[in-house]
Amino acid sequence: MQYASALSRIPSSNSTSASKGPMAIALSATGTGQIQLWQFLLELLADAVNAHCIAWEGSNGEFKLVDPDEVARKWGERKSKPNMNYDKLSRALRYYYDKNIMTKVQGKRYAYKFDFQGLAQACQSAILTNGGNPNGDLSSTVHSLSPYTNQVLPIGVTSRLSTSMSSYHSILSSTSSTSSNQIIPPSTATYWSTPQSSLTYTGMPSSY
């Protein structure tokens, strides 16, 4: 599976032209059937052409499904599920509440909010799953995954997500020096270091 990162070009405060700003990672999978819903939503949000159906609300990670039926249709099209509708989509979104990837904005219809820390962990997991190096520079790792560099994300979303990614990356780096003996339970490590001649097997026919 290929992954694409939305490396944003952030408009400056005094200009409408886009200039490359801090890294905002929004992993989205290309190909058939592998993309996750949170990745797909970030993909839609990263492209202004989708503003008619989904758009950011401010710079704190909040977004609104302007046309929830259209978002559901697009999701169904991507996943080859023609019967997809908003009811099914919203049930899938609720799954992310427990994962701390996003929450429902109370008092606002069709409004949701990404949790930057949870999203950072989800992005990091996606990188590692696809061969990224947790000990290397995160921005370099993400950049190597994708040629896409022209998506636009709100500057607040960019900076907050970048900060969360860096914080989570530091946590991973600090734990990566753990030795294999510490990671593998003692009993398991002892088993694999025991000469086979000393192991006794019972209850299994000799013909196997």
From Swiss-Prot:
- Residues covered by region (Disordered): 1-20
Signal peptide stretch:
none
Give its localization: Nucleus
The record's listing under SMART domains reads:
ETS
State the DNA-binding region(s).
35-115
Q: What does this protein do?
A: Transcription factor that plays a role in the differentiation and function of the CO(2)- and O(2)-sensing BAG neurons. The BAG neurons are required for the behavioral avoidance of environmental CO(2) and the sensing of decreased O(2) levels. Promotes the expression of genes that play a role in CO(2)- and O(2)-sensing and in egg-laying in the BAG neurons. Positively regulates the transcription of the receptor-type guanylate cyclase gcy-9, which is a critical component of the CO(2) transduction pathway, in the BAG neurons.
Sample GO molecular function, one term: DNA-binding transcription factor activity, RNA polymerase II-specific
Q: Which organism is it from?
A: Caenorhabditis elegans
Q: What is this protein called?
A: ETS domain-containing transcription factor ets-5
